[in-house]
Amino acid sequence: MNNNPNRRGSLIGPLFIYFILAMLIFMSISQLNTSNITEISYTDLVNLINQDTIISLQIDTSGLIQAKAKNGQLFQVYAPTLLMDQAYVRALANDGIKVEYIQNTGASWWVTMLIYMLPLIILMFFWFWMFRRSGTGEGIPGANYRRNPARRYDSKRNKITFNDVAGIDEVKEELEDIVNFLKDPKNFSALGAKMPKGVLLSGPPGTGKTLVARAVAGEADVPFYFMSGSDFVELFVGVGAARVRDLFKEAKENSPAIIFIDELDAVGRQRGTGLGGGHDEREQTLNALLVEMDGFDPREGIVVMAATNRPDILDKALLRPGRFDKKIFLDVPDLRAREEIIKIHLRGKRIADDIDVKSLAQSTPGFVGADLENMVNEAALLAARDNRDHITNDDFQEAIERVIVGPARKSRKITPKEKKVITYHELGHAVLGYLLPYADPVHKITIVPRGQAALGYTMQLPSEDRFLITEPEIKDKIVGMLGGRAAEEIVFNEITTGAGNDLKRATELVREMVAQLGMSEKIGPIAWGEEEGEIFLGREITRMKNFSQETAKEIDSEIKNFILSSYEKAKNLLSENRKRLDLLAIYLYNKENISGKEFKKMMEMDIEELNDYVLKDKDVKETNLFVSYA
């Protein structure tokens, strides 16, 4: 006899389906049997009898009377049996009407009750079946509360080591002790050393937190249990706590091992926020996690690693010594780190001989590891699309632009007058980027629409990584932001909506200068900010200003004056270089793209030389751009 519970559980499904089919067939037959019967009143029945239409009667003791007409039509009426007295029945029989009495056994009452109860019975069987299936790892999401959703990655398959991680040498050094402990915990125990129970990896998205954790597991050659913080919280209260206990139990059984919890803030947020109460499911899960991290012995060879983008909102009990002792921050990679990361992602890819990895790294400031990987893959896809056997520098440049602003939208139709405005707008940014001494160098100018909103853009990239920005650099940056609007007003004597985002960014930067960085003589070196309230109650709801209304007016007035003076400076510089601006506009309008090197060369030319350079170019056909917008 097979006593396998899974085998018995697998039989419930077919039986459940057969039961539903049988009930549906039964209900269909019952419906067919009653669909041809017409409900009438007792008076109508008497009239039909008097009209000699009825040929037979069936009288139920419960008061149900069924009558059959000569044409086969069936009628049904409920009437007290006292109305059908003996004398009346005999009279009917004498008239040739067949009268039959039926004893009611109560079967119809049970059938009626069963029909009413059928939906509830089906629902109960359905839930019972799904819960039985959930025990074997099947069933609906949320009902599968008995299953531990942690995914185990075998370090021997698809192994990742520190050789696959670049640009974070300091992080590797911090994690070397963890690797050595997992390889040989007895060596640490002999010296009386205790390894940290937990390692918290924090940093911006895409900086490689998960990759680092898997590299530690690969270096130590131990099992790696991966689970997202949101996986702990499910439909039923107590499920998350049970999963925490199951996760640690399984890791202990396969120690040494690494438990990695991604997006820890999903389950580890600060408690007692007033939302959900003390018995909130997430808080119960967090309590279970705190208990488990206190309960296991570090000598067991279990290391808990977690990643989050928001360490500031984690519960303080989770960060105290004895739980997540070691805290490691992964920052956005600098120039050298980007160069090393690009080299790793170029492994196994055919690239042209003239590819300069350092130049690619310089062209991608602010890119994190995930962006760089996406950029290299995008370049490979572009080369494959053109059926080329290697990746060229043009592929990489196009891939960088795709990552920053999206793919070119060649199908978007721009009218000639809109194209003129976009041309002058972008050159307003670019010319000021060259003229202002502290502005970042221009890398590329294009009027080809990209992404959702960009009708064109001017790419300015710093020549080196900067960690501090001076006041003159910020001021020149603001003037450059206003260059697009200034060019529109100078050339066409009107402005468009294209400068909306520029104004927004410039205003935000000026507000930060005035109110927080102390770069205003009138306001002074004081940080006028806002005190942020509880994150979980909503920042805007509980945010309080730490300055008076009078101070707010002074700040707004200073911001306005600074924006207006910067705008005047932008217009003056562009007006002084109007002839050069017009020649550059003719060139950009026809070519649609200007590289940073070519733009610099054109800005260094005198006006006559620039005029010959532009008008003698074979691609320049339209030259009458700036006479009138209309």
Curated annotation (Swiss-Prot):
Chief location category: membrane
Enzyme class label: hydrolase
Keywords from the UniProt entry: ATP-binding, Cell inner membrane, Cell membrane, Hydrolase, Membrane, Metal-binding, Metalloprotease, Nucleotide-binding, Protease, Transmembrane, Transmembrane helix, Zinc
Catalytic activity, EC: 3.4.24.-
One of the record's GO molecular function terms: ATP hydrolysis activity
Cytoplasmic side of membrane: 1-8, 132-630
Cofactor remark from the record: Binds 1 zinc ion per subunit.
GO cellular component, one term: plasma membrane
Residues holding ATP: 203-210
Origin superkingdom: Bacteria
Subcellular location: Cell inner membrane
Membrane topology listed for this record: Multi-pass membrane protein
Active site: 426
SMART domains: AAA
Spans traversing the lipid bilayer: 9-29, 111-131
Summary of subunit composition and partner proteins: Homohexamer.
Entry protein name: ATP-dependent zinc metalloprotease FtsH 2
